């Protein structure tokens, strides 16, 4: 089965072709970072218009690279939500039009399910069941995953997502857009320089006794330091390091607590913050002490991409999704809880 995946939930236009026997045949991604950098954040209307410009050329590109034609296509999967409504509509419209013209199934995929399943594209891949840490600019959640579509929410952020906190802290430090990766680079450079840590920031909700997160207080603590100190390169680096260490410690310890609570030994980390080197290092080190294994997507699949949508669509269709009432529906869900998707995809 050959599946075309389309991802347009925010500021990346991603497409991919996944074959259930041959694996990932081709994929392409266009990032709008440079365009939105001028405004310091994503402008929804500009994002939608750029998806319109980029999507069809990218689709033609991956078909040419894979050496297949539209007639070879068996199904289309697109990001149904959550995300920016206008951006989602672009991908949904193209998917629906192609599906109608080619007479192939069209399936809407939950964006977070795509991220959650993306480590299964790697080798070695995790097997169900596992705990998933979904950590990105819009979401921070711990899920117990017992099978495809079987997701139980263990905990989530009560305010800012981790990636959002990275971006906002970077802005306070005067770093460029996107701020999260810039902050991580600065923190890593400060650590490698051998300078001693100057600041200790709070670890919000570290000992709350549940699996929820909070990052707004951490951001406020950074603001206090910024207002108190002259922003020399050394001070800026020290604050970045202190912030990253605090955020990473909370993410690490909550994830290990979730493994202990569920009795599972596999942790899947997905989403843009999953590319953070210190987070990966800490998780690997701490998981090793309890006999657990951590799985990550390839770095190129940590951010939004079409490969994860094509793969999730293929898994859904192979599991019998073709009998689903939501197949062929032209819908988007800008706000959509992953845990609720089996109860109501159109909620």
Curated annotation (Swiss-Prot):
<keyword id="KW-0479">Metal-binding</keyword>
<feature type="binding site">
    <location>
        <begin position="134"/>
        <end position="138"/>
    </location>
    <ligand>
        <name>substrate</name>
    </ligand>
</feature>
<dbReference type="InterPro" id="IPR000905">
    <property type="entry name" value="Gcp-like_dom"/>
</dbReference>
<keyword id="KW-0808">Transferase</keyword>
<feature type="binding site">
    <location>
        <position position="115"/>
    </location>
    <ligand>
        <name>Fe cation</name>
    </ligand>
</feature>
<keyword id="KW-0012">Acyltransferase</keyword>
<keyword id="KW-0408">Iron</keyword>
<feature type="binding site">
    <location>
        <position position="180"/>
    </location>
    <ligand>
        <name>substrate</name>
    </ligand>
</feature>
<keyword id="KW-0963">Cytoplasm</keyword>
<feature type="binding site">
    <location>
        <position position="276"/>
    </location>
    <ligand>
        <name>substrate</name>
    </ligand>
</feature>
<dbReference type="GO" id="GO:0005737">
    <property type="term" value="C:cytoplasm"/>
</dbReference>
<dbReference type="GO" id="GO:0061711">
    <property type="term" value="F:N(6)-L-threonylcarbamoyladenine synthase activity"/>
</dbReference>
<comment type="function">
    <text>Required for the formation of a threonylcarbamoyl group on adenosine at position 37 (t(6)A37) in tRNAs that read codons beginning with adenine. Is involved in the transfer of the threonylcarbamoyl moiety of threonylcarbamoyl-AMP (TC-AMP) to the N6 group of A37, together with TsaE and TsaB. TsaD likely plays a direct catalytic role in this reaction.</text>
</comment>
<comment type="similarity">
    <text>Belongs to the KAE1 / TsaD family.</text>
</comment>
<dbReference type="GO" id="GO:0005506">
    <property type="term" value="F:iron ion binding"/>
</dbReference>
<dbReference type="InterPro" id="IPR022450">
    <property type="entry name" value="TsaD"/>
</dbReference>
<feature type="binding site">
    <location>
        <position position="304"/>
    </location>
    <ligand>
        <name>Fe cation</name>
    </ligand>
</feature>
<feature type="binding site">
    <location>
        <position position="111"/>
    </location>
    <ligand>
        <name>Fe cation</name>
    </ligand>
</feature>
<dbReference type="InterPro" id="IPR043129">
    <property type="entry name" value="ATPase_NBD"/>
</dbReference>
<keyword id="KW-0819">tRNA processing</keyword>
<dbReference type="InterPro" id="IPR017861">
    <property type="entry name" value="KAE1/TsaD"/>
</dbReference>
<protein>
    <recommendedName>
        <fullName>tRNA N6-adenosine threonylcarbamoyltransferase</fullName>
        <ecNumber>2.3.1.234</ecNumber>
    </recommendedName>
</protein>
<dbReference type="GO" id="GO:0002949">
    <property type="term" value="P:tRNA threonylcarbamoyladenosine modification"/>
</dbReference>
<feature type="binding site">
    <location>
        <position position="167"/>
    </location>
    <ligand>
        <name>substrate</name>
    </ligand>
</feature>
<dbReference type="Pfam" id="PF00814">
    <property type="entry name" value="TsaD"/>
</dbReference>
């Amino acid at each position: 089965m050959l599946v075309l995946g389309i991802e347009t939930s925010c500021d990346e236009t991603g497409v991919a072709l996944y074959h259930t026997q041959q694996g990932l045949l081709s994929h392409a991604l266009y990032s709008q970072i440079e365009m939105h950098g001028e405004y310091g954040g994503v402008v929804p209307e500009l994002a939608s218009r750029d998806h319109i410009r980029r999507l069809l050329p990218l689709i033609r590109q991956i078909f040419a690279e894979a050496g297949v034609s539209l007639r070879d296509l068996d199904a289309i999967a697109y990001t149904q939500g959550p995300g920016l409504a206008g951006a989602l509509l672009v991908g949904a419209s193209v998917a629906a039009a192609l599906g109608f013209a080619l007479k192939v199934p069209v399936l809407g995929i939950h964006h977070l399910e795509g991220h959650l399943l993306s480590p299964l594209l790697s080798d070695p891949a995790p097997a169900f069941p596992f705990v998933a840490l979904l950590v990105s600019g819009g979401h921070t959640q711990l899920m117990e995953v017992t099978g495809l579509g079987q997701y139980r929410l263990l905990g989530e952020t009560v305010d800012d997502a981790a990636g959002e906190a990275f971006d906002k802290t970077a802005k306070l430090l005067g770093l460029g857009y996107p701020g999260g990766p810039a902050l991580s680079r600065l923190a890593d450079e400060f650590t490698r320089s051998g300078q001693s840590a100057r600041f200790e920031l709070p670890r919000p909700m570290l000992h709350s006794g549940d699996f929820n997160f909070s990052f707004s207080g951490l951001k406020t603590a950074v603001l206090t330091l910024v207002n108190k100190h002259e922003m020399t390169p050394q001070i800026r680096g020290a604050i970045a390091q202190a912030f990253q260490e605090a955020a990473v410690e909370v993410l690490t310890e909550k994830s290990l607590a979730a493994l202990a609570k569920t009795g599972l030994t596999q942790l899947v980390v997905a989403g843009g913050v999953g590319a953070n080197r210190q987070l990966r290092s800490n998780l690997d080190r701490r998981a090793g002490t309890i006999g657990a294994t951590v799985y990550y997507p390839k770095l190129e699949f940590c951010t939004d991409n079409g490969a994860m949508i094509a793969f999730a669509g293929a898994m859904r269709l192979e599991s019998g999704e073709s009998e689903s009432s939501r197949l062929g529906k032209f819908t988007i869900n800008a706000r959509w809880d992953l845990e609720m998707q089996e109860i109501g995809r159109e909620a």
